[in-house]
């Protein structure tokens, strides 16, 4: 959501920034089973699923060298577009070559993206050029 809003603002105000996002799919790291809520109030069903599959079905995960490819594509390819989302191209975006991924419907709500930006500015005490600097 933040990447979408950054790209939108960059185009609107002429910042010259291309912003996109990427995800690694199912990759052999602990990213899916750790995080801000890990170990606090019990594991969610999704955390239990990831933990189970990571432990008992490691073949379902791609290695780190393949998992990083969507992020590398998004950051370095001249074909990567601002406002796009990249991930593995295979079934369910779990594994495969880097390709354009599906942006979740909830992440495409422009008013929510603007709100996230505003809250981020408020929480960090940072603002960026706005009106008057438009392209």
Question: Which role does the model predict for each range below?
Answer:
Residues 1-135:
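NAD(P)H-dependent oxidoreductase Rossmann-fold/reductase module
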